[in-house]
């Protein structure tokens, strides 16, 4: 089956909510992953390790500008 425009799996970028909220000057932790739009229609939020905060934080999905 060909992957077209309506492919259920899309790439998403997860960004640390703690770094964004606290305006950390060192940087912002980002992860790239995939999600299935049919199973997860809402924005994705995962607990992942942030090297700038030095602990596990919630990383939320951000919008990709193309």
Swiss-Prot record:
The keyword Ribosomal protein applies. Its main location: plastid. Pfam families: Ribosomal_L33. It is found in: Plastid, Chloroplast. GO terms for cellular component: chloroplast; ribonucleoprotein complex; ribosome. InterPro entries: Ribosomal_bL33, Ribosomal_bL33_CS, Ribosomal_bL33_sf, Ribosomal_zn-bd. GO terms for biological process: translation. GO terms for molecular function: structural constituent of ribosome. It comes from the Eukaryota. Keywords: Chloroplast, Plastid, Ribonucleoprotein, Ribosomal protein. Signal peptide: none annotated. The keyword Ribonucleoprotein applies. Belongs to the bacterial ribosomal protein bL33 family. NCBIfam families: PRK00504.1 (NF001764), PRK00595.1 (NF001860), rpmG_bact (TIGR01023). This is Large ribosomal subunit protein bL33c. It comes from Jasminum nudiflorum (Winter jasmine). The gene is rpl33.
């Amino acid at each position: 089956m060909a992957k077209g425009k309506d492919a259920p799996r899309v790439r998403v970028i997860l960004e640390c909510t703690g770094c964004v909220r606290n305006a950390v000057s060192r940087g912002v932790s980002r992860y790239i992953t995939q999600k299935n739009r049919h199973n997860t229609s809402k924005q994705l939020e995962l607990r992942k390790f942030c090297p700038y905060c030095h602990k596990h934080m919630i990383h939320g999905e951000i919008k990709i500008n193309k």
